[in-house]
Amino acid sequence: MSSQKQLEGMIFDVQSFSVHDGPGCRTTVFLNGCPLSCKWCANPESWTVRPHMMFSELSCQYENGCTVCHGKCKNGALSFNLDNKPVIDWNICKDCESFECVNSCYYNAFKLCAKPYTVDELVQVIKRDSNNWRSNGGVTFSGGEPLLQHEFLHEVLLKCHEVNIHTAIETSACVSNEVFNKIFKDIDFAFIDIKHMDREKHKEQTGVYNDLILENISNLANSDWNGRLVLRVPVISGFNDSAENISDIISFMHKNNLIEINLLPFHRLGESKWIQLGKEYEYSDKGDIDEEHLEELQDIFLDNGIACYVGHETAF
């Protein structure tokens, strides 16, 4: 038996029986790490690859007199107010590597946002779930940005294809051309996000410019890759739903012979996670996008010869 240590990946969730993340019934693997910091992000716990802590006040039993976490933090990040409620110094907490508070809590009020898996451990989970897929399912790698852990992901993809498991990815495409091209050789289906076509507006709300993203999409569309690509746009009122931006997306798609897009209406489902991470959520007052407006946007794409799906209405 080889003594060589296997690659490990950091994963914050594995969801079985997913039906909106690619063809058929799928297992979706959420990998840690993301080069973007979208202000509306539904999974802000995924931004860093290294483990870090979240605190759920709803799960905490401080009102019932629980004190099991008292004195556990050796770094001075955890104190308590007069009501016994935990008060966290997130500037100290972000550098923690021992997580005594997590290990002490019976109620999962303190929890880690990442769990290590070896390549074989993750593939075993995927193979186990394959019994539920029938003939048209597979595995989808999401995040975060799964391409940030490209070495680990590459090994998992190779093992999946060894046993004919269909592979899909949900990605921002915000990685080097080299990494992007290497991984996509083993991808059968892809969702790639376009947040905004204007590079300055893109950076304002995501923290990065979109040049590399658009370059990777264009290169993929004009390559000999034979997988299926669906672009995705998280539609946010007042940010990327203008006639100008929609027109720019259509022009980009026509230029690159791209024929499918998925419009995802904005939601605030990740707001509680921001609070649990001690972060300010700037979109708390942002309203849901009007369904009639979404249908109007859909009609614009359809009128321009582009298959357009709203929400989870994808043509699987």
From Swiss-Prot:
Residues of the 4Fe-4S ferredoxin-type domain: 84-115
Domain of life of the native organism: Bacteria
InterPro entries: 4-hPhe_decarboxylase_activase, 4Fe4S_Fe-S-bd, Aldolase_TIM, BssD/PflA/YjjW, Organic_radical-activating, Organic_radical_activase, Radical_activat_CS, rSAM
UniProt: [4Fe-4S] cluster 2 binding residues: C60, C66, C69, C105
Keyword set, alphabetical order: 4Fe-4S, Iron, Iron-sulfur, Metal-binding, Oxidoreductase, S-adenosyl-L-methionine
Catalyzed reactions: glycyl-[protein] + reduced [flavodoxin] + S-adenosyl-L-methionine = glycin-2-yl radical-[protein] + semiquinone [flavodoxin] + 5'-deoxyadenosine + L-methionine + H(+)
Enzyme class: oxidoreductase
Amino-acid positions noted as binding S-adenosyl-L-methionine in the UniProt annotation, renumbered to this chain: W40, C41, A42, G144, D193, I194, K195, H267
Family: Belongs to the organic radical-activating enzymes family.
Subunit-structure text: Monomer.
Protein name: 4-hydroxyphenylacetate decarboxylase activating enzyme
Biological source species: Clostridioides difficile (strain CD196) (Peptoclostridium difficile)
Gene name, Swiss-Prot/TrEMBL: hpdA
